[in-house]
């Protein structure tokens, strides 16, 4: 077909269509704005449902939603009364998007409801004397009532989903193929809660969270599962069936690992239990000093139940007590010896008592230490020094009658 034939067969409406496309390029309109302009043209027929459905998909995108809403409001404010068809079509498109579009779009429309209220006083009388503004006023009144009632919005959106499901859900007994359109547009509620109450309660008693409808049994996920019957429910790889014979080997290995871990824990517990059960055995009958291994007088020398005492008691005769030191370097020993020699005759009874006391230093020290059995063994040398000092003072008193060493 030649260009002349194409121009000859072109109607006035086709010329307007190409002219609008040229305007979109000149004024740098986006694709979504061009679709809105196409749906709100000045033709005597309404926009197609396919075009309005494509526009409703754009309400789920933030940028396209702003473009759609701004272009619709421009139709309200920039058009004259003679272009009442474009205003009426813009109101019709807005009503469709509220019922089928995103819930965020409803919130944005409510924020700009004052621009819609301006059209409540719209008037236009054509050349034939007919008031064409009554159609616009009626549509504006119904739209404001819809935006003011949340329950009505939920009911209308539910009805729109059911209607769309009848005509779009299934064709020829099989699930429809996924097209370029958004499957969520007007059929399921979004997860984002907006300002409107309808956004918060749109899914109550209407559809489930997985996209299924509770009343009529429609489930988007179920239809996808039935379309591919070969793909059944796959079990995870780590799942082990303990009741089947095939999984006996891995189950035995798991049981052996658990038993091994339990044995290790029991071994750790046994070590601590042995440590706690080792209660020290005390023997009050024989209180041994680590530095003095000789038992207390009057008590029979019995071996202790502790193993380290047995090794020390075997050499009691060989070990000399650390408390009583028989030989010690004393600068005044010569003076004591001369004093004892001179006073040996008159003080024989006292000297004999002193010799008896000196001959048995262990008994004196043990009797003195019997009162301090609960003290620490580290201070045993201090007690021994005190006993030896008492012996020296006794010897000084015995010889004080003849010679006073302090008088020098």
Curated annotation (Swiss-Prot):
Effect of residue 275 to A: Reduced binding to GGA2
One term of GO molecular function: phospholipid binding
Cited SUPFAM superfamilies: ENTH/VHS domain (SSF48464)
Record field: compositional bias (Basic and acidic residues): 249-263, 399-408
Alphabetical GO biological process terms: actin cytoskeleton organization; early endosome to Golgi transport; endocytosis; Golgi to endosome transport; late endosome to vacuole transport via multivesicular body sorting pathway; multivesicular body sorting pathway; protein transport
Membrane topology recorded in Swiss-Prot or TrEMBL: Peripheral membrane protein
Key word Acetylation present: yes
Modified residues (Phosphoserine): 196, 198, 203, 212, 223
Residues covered by region (Disordered): 162-182, 199-322, 338-408
Effect after changing residue 272 to A: Reduced binding to GGA2
Localization, UniProt: Cytoplasm; Golgi apparatus, trans-Golgi network membrane; Cytoplasmic vesicle, Clathrin-coated vesicle membrane
Designated name of the protein: Epsin-3
